[in-house]
């Protein structure tokens, strides 16, 4: 533990780890700003955001698990020169997680009220939660695909690309929330979060496709 770390190892660790660390810090900062904006709509809105995030974990925790496994799988096969095997693993993971995301989207959009009633009893809180689940439901499948694609790119050592895309589009939630919030109220903030997730995965998947073509 006290031995000197070789410089080339340290550089490699920092090259892969620092972009991801910055992305995590940026996401936390943006979430705090959005929470401050949401708090202006009352306690029900804040509660909906917090509980909604826990409900969403059904989809993103699953996708995150696949992303972690895919990261190791892609890195192993890329290092061994078995790029075709890595591509097959990515496609299989993408289909699995995509179908799961679509299922969660369908549940959120089609039966939001029974889900909301599990966590809330006040009519206003239930109504706010129902709107949240419907709007966020449109982005669940996209979010699952995004996390899986990020896992694949990270396995190739392209963490900087993933972080730049994620920070750029996640940051766009703030001005978009201000604009849509002024027009649609609280629902505008939900739409800002949902729409940026959809755009993020579209762009990330495009860059991943370009990366795979050059392997």
Predicted regions, residues:
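Helix-terminus/linker motif at the lipid-water interface of multi-pass membrane proteins
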Residues: 25-54, 58, 76-77, 114-123, ...
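Hydrophobic alpha-helical segments, especially transmembrane helices
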Residues: 16, 24, 51, 55-57, ...
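Hydrophobic faces of transmembrane alpha-helices in multi-pass small-molecule transporters and flippases
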Residues: 2-33, 58-62, 66, 133, ...
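Hydrophobic alpha-helical transmembrane segments of integral membrane proteins
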Residues: 10-12, 28, 45, 58-62, ...
């Amino acid at each position: 533990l006290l031995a000197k770390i070789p410089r080339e190892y340290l550089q490699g660790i920092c090259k892969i780890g620092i972009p991801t660390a910055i992305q995590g810090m940026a996401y936390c900062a943006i979430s705090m700003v959005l929470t401050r904006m949401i708090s202006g709509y009352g306690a029900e809105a804040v509660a909906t955001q917090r509980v909604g995030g826990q409900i969403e974990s059904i989809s993103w925790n699953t996708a995150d698990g696949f992303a972690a496994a895919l990261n190791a799988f892609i890195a192993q096969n890329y290092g061994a020169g078995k790029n075709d095997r890595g591509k097959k693993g990515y496609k299989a993971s993408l289909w699995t997680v995509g179908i799961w995301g679509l299922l969660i989207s369908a549940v959120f959009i089609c039966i939001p009220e029974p889900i909301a009633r599990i966590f809330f009893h006040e009519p206003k809180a239930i109504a706010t939660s129902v709107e949240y689940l419907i709007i966020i439901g449109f982005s669940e499948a996209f979010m699952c695909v995004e996390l899986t694609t990020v896992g694949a790119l990270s396995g190739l050592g392209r963490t900087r690309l993933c972080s730049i895309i994620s920070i750029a589009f996640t940051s766009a939630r703030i001005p978009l929330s201000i604009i849509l919030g002024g027009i649609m109220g609280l629902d505008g903030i939900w739409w800002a979060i949902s729409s940026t997730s959809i755009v993020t995965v579209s762009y990330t998947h495009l860059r991943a496709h370009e990366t795979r073509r050059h392997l």
